[in-house]
Amino acid sequence: MTALNVLIYPDDHLKVVCEPVTKVNDAIRKIVDDMFDTMYQEKGIGLAAPQVDILQRIITIDVEGDKQNQFVLINPEILASEGETGIEEGCLSIPGFRALVPRKEKVTVRALDRDGKEFTLDADGLLAICIQHEIDHLNGILFVDYLSPLKRQRIKEKLIKYKKQIAKS
């Protein structure tokens, strides 16, 4: 297993609508394993494939961070949602920034697991928020897209400067 490089906003690949996975095979399972490694190394609770420059509809989630309740969602689709909630969200692709994002309190999602078997998951609380955040990534949407243009531009400018500093070191 290998940790992958996380793309930083405003990388254009973060704005791409990802393609569905056509077949879950060993190559896809390797991607899933590498995504979990990356997510834990970066101290995240969720990761979408486009964040590591893989433009396929794959999500890994572990809101507890203990490797006991891992979720793999391949080709996820929200079937139902209800309630209103929101928390200050962060994102591995937008380091150092957080913002309040409106989300649904509960979601029902259908997806494939790491073996290609279809399942349905009812989620609420942080898990529901994380699922929505990561599905947004698969659709080329970042949490900054929920912010005002001015706030989004300020974050973009700061992260461009941050990326230049990293490139120099």
Curated annotation (Swiss-Prot):
Gene3D superfamilies: Peptide deformylase (3.90.45.10). Keywords: Hydrolase, Iron, Metal-binding, Protein biosynthesis. One of its GO terms (biological process) is co-translational protein modification. Binds 1 Fe(2+) ion. InterPro entries: Peptide_deformylase, Peptide_deformylase_sf. Fe cation binds at C91, H133, H137. Its cofactor is Fe(2+). It catalyses: N-terminal N-formyl-L-methionyl-[peptide] + H2O = N-terminal L-methionyl-[peptide] + formate. GO terms for molecular function: metal ion binding; peptide deformylase activity. Its EC number is 3.5.1.88. It comes from the Bacteria. The keyword Iron applies. The active site is at E134. Belongs to the polypeptide deformylase family. HAMAP family: Pep_deformylase. Removes the formyl group from the N-terminal Met of newly synthesized proteins. Requires at least a dipeptide for an efficient rate of reaction. N-terminal L-methionine is a prerequisite for activity but the enzyme has broad specificity at other positions. This is Peptide deformylase. It comes from Haemophilus influenzae (strain ATCC 51907 / DSM 11121 / KW20 / Rd).
